[in-house]
Amino acid sequence: MGEMVRIAVVHDEKLLRSALVQLLRSDDTLDVSSHCLDADGPELSAALPADVCVVDGECLTGPEDAGAGRLRARYGDRLVVLATAKRPGVLRRAFDGGALGLVDKNAPAHRLITAVHTVARGERFLDETLTVALLKGAEMPLTTRELGVLTLASQGAPIAEIAARLHLSRGTVRNYMATAVRKVGARNRVDAIRIVQSAGWT
């Protein structure tokens, strides 16, 4: 037997995390551990000594993206991100963040194992089924500021709070909101939030 490859599995949902661990342990060259990103807090990076980290792309979303930052700080590009073509924004963030592996959640189990070994060698792995979605993610029409305004609005923040948190005037926030609604082809603010969330841009 060759040298073992240490794998850390990160997922917010216990059942799915356990299923991923069992799948990966079917390969006896993989030494697998698992953790919940939220529960481990800032100590996460020190707690997971591994060669490759397998993480659900949905764990890397959010306005602060703090969990993604901790994982990248610990593993660099040795990330295998699980994603779907329905969420091009999630794919784009993972790719732009330097993750070497992008695996379709609908792919056969052996694809994940292949991806892990590929990334462990420092090589890129991209499921062909995700290629078009990855390109769509690059077409996200909103600026960082417009996306930030919509993200805060999606959390229920009123105009005044958004203005205070982003150090903008209320009028400027309204302008950003109106521009974002127009750019994504939405009917209103609620529709714009739905569109960007469905695409995985927030």
UniProtKB/Swiss-Prot annotation:
<dbReference type="InterPro" id="IPR011006">
    <property type="entry name" value="CheY-like_superfamily"/>
</dbReference>
<keyword id="KW-0010">Activator</keyword>
<feature type="region of interest" description="Response regulatory">
    <location>
        <begin position="1"/>
        <end position="121"/>
    </location>
</feature>
<dbReference type="InterPro" id="IPR036388">
    <property type="entry name" value="WH-like_DNA-bd_sf"/>
</dbReference>
<dbReference type="InterPro" id="IPR000792">
    <property type="entry name" value="Tscrpt_reg_LuxR_C"/>
</dbReference>
<dbReference type="InterPro" id="IPR016032">
    <property type="entry name" value="Sig_transdc_resp-reg_C-effctor"/>
</dbReference>
<protein>
    <recommendedName>
        <fullName>Response regulator RamR</fullName>
    </recommendedName>
</protein>
<keyword id="KW-0805">Transcription regulation</keyword>
<keyword id="KW-0804">Transcription</keyword>
<keyword id="KW-0238">DNA-binding</keyword>
<feature type="DNA-binding region" description="H-T-H motif">
    <location>
        <begin position="159"/>
        <end position="178"/>
    </location>
</feature>
<comment type="function">
    <text>A transcription factor required for aerial hyphae formation on rich medium. Activates transcription of ramC. Might be part of a two-component regulatory system. Binds the promoter of ramC. Non-phosphorylated protein cooperatively binds multiple sites in the ramC promoter. Has not been seen to autophosphorylate using the small molecule phosphodonors phosphoramidate, acetyl phosphate or carbamoyl phosphate.</text>
</comment>
<keyword id="KW-0597">Phosphoprotein</keyword>
<dbReference type="InterPro" id="IPR039420">
    <property type="entry name" value="WalR-like"/>
</dbReference>
<dbReference type="Pfam" id="PF00196">
    <property type="entry name" value="GerE"/>
</dbReference>
<dbReference type="GO" id="GO:0006355">
    <property type="term" value="P:regulation of DNA-templated transcription"/>
</dbReference>
<dbReference type="GO" id="GO:0003677">
    <property type="term" value="F:DNA binding"/>
</dbReference>
<feature type="domain" description="HTH luxR-type">
    <location>
        <begin position="135"/>
        <end position="200"/>
    </location>
</feature>
<comment type="subunit">
    <text>Homodimer, in the absence of phosphorylation.</text>
</comment>
